[in-house]
């Protein structure tokens, strides 16, 4: 992605893995008696642990495909005169156009799926690295719910400030500049943390003027996967991470995505997956107060989709939400900027409904629809990736031997992980293994669930 990158000092790998081993042993000792006494009921929901690991692997792989595909078109089309007209299906496979700030992207000149082959690494981005951070903190603290202090300490340790960030060159000819890969509300929250603030005060509009932006809805979806089948517990786990950067309607929308991810374990690839996802979205939208802006936006986009006889013509609905919300302002929403939570929530629903459960089509529409396009493409890529599982994703993109490694130190720092002696590199399979341990803990501590003595099934 760039010719030079500064790697911070890497230490204490052995110490980390020893701590992880002790944590696993501690979890085993704590739960052996509970597992021995657990009564399994035929009516209980059962989750195959190895299958769940494959699904978590698929979440990271699908999210990375969606993220890096969406980054090609990110902020290219935001409804301003200088960026019009919007993209359509006809633009797929054609040359990328500059973002509204005037730059292209270094990783692709063509609007198409961006796939990283084995031997190379998927780069971290703000759509993936904060979820990685939160999963790491849960494993580190052996906790089912993070405290405000744990979140603050984790952010300060693993993210850069604007002053100590490495120098970054977007293109070979670019002038190097410091880049901490934090923007909008994330950046505001970190500055507040440096001043001693902790969540939820880091999203208080009194101090954080960007708390109505998109940040939380792209950094917290993983909490749904850490609490399968219990969306209310997932939302409780995500309460502070969401309110690290979001308040009001932005926080409500983040809850919506967490809810959908929590119940996604019940879904599998099928001819009716699109309809199942639509029903799940309708259920998740019950979280919204009846007269709230997110509720009205959801109902408008859903109604426009349902009434559109051509289910390939997603552009018709995109143009309608542009007119209704950006040009005219309706349903209590006044458009401010292309990072707004609400306009991107509406845009994400377009790709969810018209994508109809098809991984490729959903990512394609999300990348073309406009505004902050890498966010819905990453969100739905991750959700569908989880539903499909890693093995099925690789069949969908069989033309490429897809990479399973993740370069977390592209954007963040101080993570005690390496792959083939390369610091800051992780593997999706190992990430899924660690996250399954978190799921085990959450189910036993928060959901009165059981794990059988063979560690093969989770009973909820």
What are the roles of these predicted feature ranges?
Residues 18-28:
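Bacterial N-terminal signal peptides
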Residues 31-36:
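Boundary at the C-terminal end of the N-terminal hydrophobic targeting segment
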Residues 61, 120-126, 130, 135-254:
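Active-site cavity-forming subdomains of large catalytic enzyme subunits
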Residues 65, 69, 76-92, 246-249, ...:
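Catalytic phosphate/nucleotide-handling subdomain of diverse soluble enzymes
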Residues 1-13:
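N-terminal secretory signal peptides that target proteins for export/translocation
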Residues 71-115, 128-130, 148-169:
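Active-site-surrounding "flap" and adjacent substrate/cofactor-binding loops of secreted or lumenal enzymes
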Residues 47, 185-213, 220-231, 239-244, ...:
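Accessory "access/gating" subregions that flank catalytic or transport cores
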Residues 458-460:
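Conserved small/polar residues in nucleotide/adenosyl-binding loops
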């Amino acid at each position: 992605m760039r010719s030079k990158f500064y790697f911070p000092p890497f230490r204490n790998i052995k110490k980390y893995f020893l701590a992880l081993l002790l944590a696993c042993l501690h979890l085993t000792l704590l739960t052996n008696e509970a597992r021995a006494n657990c009564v399994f009921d035929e009516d209980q929901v059962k989750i195959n642990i190895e299958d769940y690991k494959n699904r978590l692997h698929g979440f990271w792989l699908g999210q990375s495909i969606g993220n890096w595909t969406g980054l090609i078109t990110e902020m290219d089309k935001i409804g301003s005169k200088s960026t019009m007209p919007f993209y359509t299906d006809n633009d797929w496979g054609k040359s990328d156009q500059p973002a509204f700030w005037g730059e292209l992207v270094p990783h692709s000149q063509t609007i198409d799926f961006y796939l990283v082959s084995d031997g190379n690494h998927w780069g971290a981005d703000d759509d993936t690295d904060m979820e990685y951070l939160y999963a790491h903190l849960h494993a580190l603290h052996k906790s089912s719910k993070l405290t405000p202090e744990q979140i603050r300490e984790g952010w300060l340790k693993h993210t850069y400030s604007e002053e100590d960030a490495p120098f970054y060159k977007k293109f070979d000819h670019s002038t190097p500049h410091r880049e901490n890969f934090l923007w909008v509300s994330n950046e505001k929250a970190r500055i507040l943390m440096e001043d001693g603030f902790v969540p939820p005060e880091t999203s208080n509009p009194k101090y954080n003027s960007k708390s109505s932006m998109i940040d939380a809805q792209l950094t917290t979806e993983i909490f749904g996967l850490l609490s399968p089948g219990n969306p209310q517990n997932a939302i409780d786990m995500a309460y502070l991470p969401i309110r690290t950067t979001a308040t009001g309607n932005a926080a409500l929308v983040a809850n919506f995505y967490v809810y959908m991810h929590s119940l996604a374990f019940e879904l599998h690839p099928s001819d009716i997956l699109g309809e199942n996802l639509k029903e799940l979205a309708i259920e998740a939208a019950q979280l919204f107060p009846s007269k709230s802006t997110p509720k009205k936006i959801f109902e408008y986009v859903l109604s426009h989709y349902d009434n559109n006889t051509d289910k390939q013509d997603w552009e018709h609905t995109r143009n309608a939400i542009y007119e209704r919300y950006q040009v005219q302002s309706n349903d209590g929403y006044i458009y401010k900027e292309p990072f707004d939570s609400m306009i991107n929530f509406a845009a994400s629903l377009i790709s969810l409904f018209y994508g109809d459960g098809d991984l490729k089509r959903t990512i394609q529409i999300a990348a073309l629809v406009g505004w902050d396009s890498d966010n819905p493409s990453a969100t739905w890529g991750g959700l569908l990736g989880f539903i499909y599982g890693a093995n099925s994703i690789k069949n969908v993109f069989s033309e490429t031997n897809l990479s399973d490694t993740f370069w977390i130190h592209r954007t963040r720092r101080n993570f005690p992980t390496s792959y083939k002696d390369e610091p800051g590199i992780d593997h999706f399979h190992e990430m899924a293994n660690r996250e399954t341990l978190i799921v085990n803990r959450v189910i036993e501590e928060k959901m009165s669930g059981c794990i059988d003595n063979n560690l093969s099934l989770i009973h909820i």
